[in-house]
Amino acid sequence: MSFGPLVTAGWLREHIGDRDLTVIDFRWHLLGPDGRDEYLRGHIPGAVFVDLEAVTGTRGGGRHPLPAAWQVQDEMQKAGVDDGTKVVVYDDAGGSVAARLWFLLGWFGHGAQAVLDGGMRAWGEPLETRIPSVVRGAFRSRPPDRTRILDFEAVQLLEGVPLIDARAGERYRGDSEPVDPKAGHVPGALSAPWVENLRADGLFKSAEELRDRYFSLGVEEGAVVYCGSGVNACHDLLAMELAGVPNGRLYAGSWSDWSHHDAPVATGKEPG
């Protein structure tokens, strides 16, 4: 039976004690509280904390380069993950951070990973502060599919392929830019803020609604997505998979890479 890319809070409540399940708390905030501190104050029972920075590389453009295979392998082993383990990842940010680990696990060949739909908000049960005792797992990273990753040079050469900007509309338009040196977007990019993949209650929209959203933008198989640093873009990649638009690709360095180059910048609500 296939697993993922989403599980409901009801499913997790039913399976929380399964021996072949690992729950990972992946909370992180760009300009907010420390995720580990939040984990220590309370987390889903049995959940193990994994820090975004621990699965972020040191080579490549942007603020959050993709990790080396050994980094993901080591962190997953420390979390108790084996090759056959189902992994559920959650955050408190609508899945916009958890989707990054979902993407990385798939990219490194795990194949049994899911995001908790609605995250902490949907859990709705008591939290615990006890740190679980974990037996080191035997997870092994497989060689990643490099065709799903684009760098600055590859994005410059894109022709006839939709380029999607997953950031908030104000950052796309260039009205504000909280962290990077330039405001605006990559010329030609279409605005598809990740938050619009969600309903008002914080759950993902239906597959049909997501399909309508992305097809109306002209998104097709092989579309490229970017955000600020390659984290939140994975939310759009997950939504595209739910919508039946497979093989989405990631501009890993995203705007934090593009804006540091001597490259053209578009502003306003049009792609430019």
Segments from the language model and where they lie:
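Active-site neighborhoods of enzymes that stabilize oxyanions during catalysis
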Residues: M1-T8, E14, M120-L190, D262-G272
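Terminal peptide-recognition signature
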Residues: L12, A47, L105, A189, ...
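Helix-loop module immediately N-terminal to the HCX5R catalytic loop
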Residues: G57-K86, P193-A223
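Thiolate-centered catalytic microenvironments shared by cysteine-dependent enzyme domains
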Residues: R63-L158, D175, V231-S254
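Extended hydrophobic/aromatic segments used for targeting, binding, or gating
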Residues: H15-G17, E208, P246-A252, S256-G272
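Hydrophobic alpha-helical membrane-insertion signals
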Residues: A9-D37
